[in-house]
């Protein structure tokens, strides 16, 4: 039976403060729980890409087509809610086209860790409102996949509030090794420009915040169950080397019983996966099925 969802858009996730229009999220909530025990369902949380700087990609247009597919899919009964998080963006560069909405002025001034702080603030807001604990799947595309894995290292940094890590992370066309991204840039000097804008000129920082360089996923993600690495068959921007280096980084973590590291291939180019929605939705659906299989094997 199809699950019916209500869409709430542009919700500020920073309380008692004046939020930027980028510090908002969208939520899709079932109008009623049709599957009984809600403690066995999952929240799906999307993080859009756009090289930390593209105002034409936002929480709504990134997720809305995938959501339409998910609410009519075979796993809709397992979904407790869906969210998509906006975050502040880095400065534009001269080579970047003017966004369709016009000039954004001085509003794009974010630099690491601003993007990450915003994503975590969005997750913490959702946790306070819905209390789903670890029962969520963090799904990021391109730099959104970077941010998804960076939420794990944020736990070890100076933060007054912490959040429960997800049971699963889906990285779609993810950027996992930032120096490697710069070195294999198919459109020089595009990657170098947006990495400078997002992280500054210290390339030691680029390496330190690259998920593929994290040394101990067992310590960073002890409650994790599933890592899904997705690549696009005709990706114009991201080399398969990004997936390969991340798979290698997760190998030891994934050897523990009750965990999986999976790779998926999608047809099409870098942005086609979310623009059509079906690719993004299929990754989530397969991941929910993987998690259910893990639960059965643990029972």
Swiss-Prot record:
<dbReference type="InterPro" id="IPR029058">
    <property type="entry name" value="AB_hydrolase_fold"/>
</dbReference>
<protein>
    <recommendedName>
        <fullName>Kynurenine formamidase-like hydrolase fscH</fullName>
        <ecNumber>3.5.1.-</ecNumber>
    </recommendedName>
</protein>
<comment type="pathway">
    <text>Secondary metabolite biosynthesis.</text>
</comment>
<comment type="similarity">
    <text>Belongs to the kynurenine formamidase family.</text>
</comment>
<feature type="region of interest" description="Disordered">
    <location>
        <begin position="90"/>
        <end position="110"/>
    </location>
</feature>
<keyword id="KW-0378">Hydrolase</keyword>
<feature type="short sequence motif" description="HGGXW">
    <location>
        <begin position="48"/>
        <end position="52"/>
    </location>
</feature>
<comment type="function">
    <text>Kynurenine formamidase-like hydrolase; part of the fragmented gene cluster that mediates the biosynthesis of fusarochromene, a tryptophan-derived metabolite closely related to a group of mycotoxins including fusarochromanone. Within the pathway, fscH converts the product of fscD into 4-hydroxykyrunenine. The first step of the pathway is the epimerization of L-tryptophan to D-tryptophan in the presence of the NRPS-like tryptophan epimerase fscC. D-tryptophan is subsequently hydroxylated by the tryptophan 6-hydroxylase fscE to yield 6-hydroxytryptophan.</text>
</comment>
<dbReference type="GO" id="GO:0016787">
    <property type="term" value="F:hydrolase activity"/>
</dbReference>
<feature type="active site" description="Nucleophile">
    <location>
        <position position="142"/>
    </location>
</feature>
<dbReference type="InterPro" id="IPR050300">
    <property type="entry name" value="GDXG_lipolytic_enzyme"/>
</dbReference>
């Amino acid at each position: 039976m199809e699950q019916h969802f209500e869409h709430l858009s542009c919700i500020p996730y920073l309380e008692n403060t004046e939020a930027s229009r980028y510090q908002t999220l969208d939520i899709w909530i079932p109008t009623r729980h049709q599957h009984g025990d809600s403690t066995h369902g999952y929240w799906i949380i999307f993080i859009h890409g756009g090289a930390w700087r593209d105002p034409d990609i936002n929480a709504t247009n990134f997720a809305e087509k995938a959501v339409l597919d998910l609410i009519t899919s075979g796993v809709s009964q397992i979904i407790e809610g869906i969210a998509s998080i906006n975050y502040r963006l880095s400065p534009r560069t001269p080579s970047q086209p003017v966004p369709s909405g016009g000039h954004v002025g001085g509003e794009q001034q974010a630099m690491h860790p601003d993007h990450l702080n915003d994503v975590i603030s969005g997750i913490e807001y959702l946790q306070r409102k819905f209390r789903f604990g670890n029962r969520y799947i963090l799904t990021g595309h391109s730099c959104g996949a970077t941010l998804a894995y960076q939420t794990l290292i944020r736990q070890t940094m100076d933060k007054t509030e912490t959040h429960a890590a997800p049971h699963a992370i889906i990285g779609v066309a993810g950027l996992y090794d930032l120096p490697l991204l710069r070195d294999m840039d198919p459109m020089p000097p595009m990657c170098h420009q947006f990495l400078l804008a997002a992280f500054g000129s210290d390339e030691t920082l680029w390496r330190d915040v690259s998920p593929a360089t994290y040394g101990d996923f067992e310590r960073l993600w002890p409650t994790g169950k599933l890592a899904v690495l997705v690549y696009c068959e005709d990706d114009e921007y991201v080399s398969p080397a990004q997936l390969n280096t991340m798979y290698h980084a997760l190998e030891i973590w994934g050897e523990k019983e009750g965990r999986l590291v999976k790779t998926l291939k999608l047809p099409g180019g870098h942005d086609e996966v979310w623009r059509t929605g079906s690719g993004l939705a299929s990754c989530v659906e397969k991941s929910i099925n993987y998690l259910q299989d893990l639960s059965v094997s643990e029972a």
